[in-house]
Amino acid sequence: MPTTAFSAGVETNDVEISYAKEATWGTKPAVAFKAVRYTGESFSGSKSRARPAEIRNDYQATGAVTTQETASAGINFALSSGTYDDILAGLLGNDFSTAIAISGVDIAGTATGYSTATAGKFTTVTAGVWIKVSGFANAANNGYKRVTAATGTSITTAQAGAVEAAGPSVTIGGSRLTNGTAFQSFHFQKKLASALYLVYPGTFWTGGTITAATGQFFTGSFTGISAIESKATTNQSTGAVTAAPTGRVNDGVAGFQGLEWNNAAVSAVINGITLNIAREGAAAQYGLGSAAAQGVLRGVVTVTGSVEIYFRDFALYDDYKSETARALTYRTVDDAGSGYQISLPAAYLMNPRITAGGPGQSVMATFELEGSPHSTLGYTIAVDKF
């Protein structure tokens, strides 16, 4: 028989974080919640109190009153494929596009991409997206490709291919998310025990970070604001909570598949890259008659970051001096090849720090990254998933 009454309180390993998308801000949807993998969380509520500066002859401060009640949301994570797609989409104000799901034995490889004799087979593919191709006998035709042009019967890619007749069973897949204007909020719950829950309605994500560093797996965090924190004794999910994806976390070795700048591989050795997404100006809205938030200001999407390389030449430094906007993109995948291509179509390198930190050390160059809306594409960041 197992021993009982051994614990002084709730253990962190028993805490489950789950969520559902809201149709109406702050209102719990009648759907199954989804569990989230996480390495730490910081969901919490707080009250703002104020007291008048009254002049009193008893030399005591006047009692305080509650003026606002707030709640904050936070998740730290190790990046794994598919786990945070909803949260990332909410942060960027958009949805991933309908997945490209093309397959068949009627797809041929060409020196510049792919062709088919089947009319309309490639109509779901558009210029600019990244796709994952598999099934060809020639390895040059498989892998991750950036589409530069597409029609119903042909796809042109930035990466060279090889002439290969149709015949093998080939699959082409991908889905794209860009920053948009849609507002998406979530209903989160923190399960502490079978009858102990904390609930965070109206959660709106206002910031996120993804970091790759030598010797580490991909890490990240999301931060946001919630309408209020309240307690509950029952599960808010309609039915059982859906389990989180179980894929392996993305590592910084095979899981990092190169950084491109201006559509060419960066020749320098990369030591680390960080991207920060923020909704500047996002805030809860308050009014008379209630301490709780009455609405949300969405803010505007900004993308910043940094990249650190082993210094060897002035190739990137020259773009900093000229303030030339370039396309930046990198890919991260798990051991099954599932993952993301993260792209800034109009990025600037700024404020490099090229320093000799001490004897016997590598000279590193750290550049700040600044994303801007692309003049013709109209977005600041794109995330393709495979």
For each predicted feature, which ranges?
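Signature of extracytoplasmic/envelope-associated structural regions
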Residues: 1-386
